[in-house]
Design a protein with these regions (language model features):
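Generic hydrophobic/aromatic pocket-lining and core-packing "Φ" positions
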Residues: 35, 58, 105-109, 133
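Residues in the short beta-alpha loop(s) of Rossmann-like NAD(P)-binding domains
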Residues: 50-54, 125, 149
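Rossmann-fold NAD(P)-binding glycine/threonine-rich loop
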Residues: 122-140, 152-157
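C-terminal capping/lid region of NAD(P)-dependent oxidoreductase domains
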Residues: 71, 83, 87, 118-119, ...
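Mid-domain Rossmann-like dinucleotide-binding core that forms the NAD(H)/NADP(H) cofactor-binding site
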Residues: 1-75, 79
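Glycine- and charged-residue-rich phosphate/anionic-cofactor binding loop of Rossmann-like
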Residues: 145-147, 159-182
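N-terminal Rossmann-like NAD(P) cofactor-binding module of classical short-chain dehydrogenase/reductase
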Residues: 93-94
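Helix-to-beta-strand junctions that scaffold the AdoMet/dcAdoMet cofactor pocket
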Residues: 112-115
Length: 205
């Protein structure tokens, strides 16, 4: 599922392709899958952001193709993005965060290039007070909703997995038995076993 989302959100919705510059916010299983697909699609610059607790995930992001990783708790992410891009900003901003509120959307809007960028959002917010509509329209930004994936995305994701081009074993970090389903879910959310990215359930464990 994460890899199929990677295809749908970055390739189909974000229109990432050859020489694209991309900001991926959140280095979890979704963000890392976006990293793989963006690299496969020919993106020339991939920036992944996360927090200090995401250290292990950020290292995996670099091994999967991220050119830069930014700890948003240690650096000003917008200033760093502009430094990396020479003040131009990025073509596409992908929000793969969870529970971060409006911050990823606001950063995405600011980090996009001067005109015509695309932001793909998960849309978990019920409302967005003081949305920067003027800046959004002046920059001619297109916002798309990241809501699942299509059959075509699944087919391409399976082909990507079968190609073994990327060390995807780094993403599937832990295995749990059925008796530990609750622990597995909490761990993926950062509240159980540390440094879990993607958990596999093994009935025989």
């Amino acid at each position: 599922t994460p890899m199929a989302n990677g295809v749908e959100w970055s390739l189909f919705d974000g229109e990432v392709g050859y020489n694209s510059t991309v900001l991926i916010q959140g280095p979890g299983q979704q963000g890392l899958s976006q990293t793989v697909i963006c690299k496969q699609a020919g993106a020339s610059l991939i920036i992944v952001t996360g927090t200090s607790k995401d250290g292990a995930r950020m290292e995996v992001a670099k091994k999967l193709g991220a050119d830069y990783v930014i700890d948003v708790q240690k650096e000003d992410p917008l200033a760093r993005i502009m430094e990396i891009t020479g003040g131009k900003g990025v073509d596409v901003a992908l929000d793969c965060t969870a529970g971060a509120g409006t911050i990823p959307i606001l950063l995405g809007i600011e980090a996009l290039k001067r005109k015509g960028g695309i932001i793909v959002a998960q849309g978990e917010l019920a409302s967005f007070p003081n949305f920067p509509l003027e800046k959004f329209t002046v920059k001619f930004i297109t916002m798309k909703s990241a809501r699942g994936h299509s059959y075509k995305a699944c087919e391409l994701a399976l082909e990507q997995l079968a190609s073994k081009r990327f060390p995807l074993e780094l993403v599937t970090t832990h295995k749990f038995g059925l008796k530990d389903v609750d622990l597995a879910i909490r761990s993926v959310g950062g509240k159980g076993v540390p440094d879990v990215i993607h958990a596999s359930l093994m009935p025989w464990l």
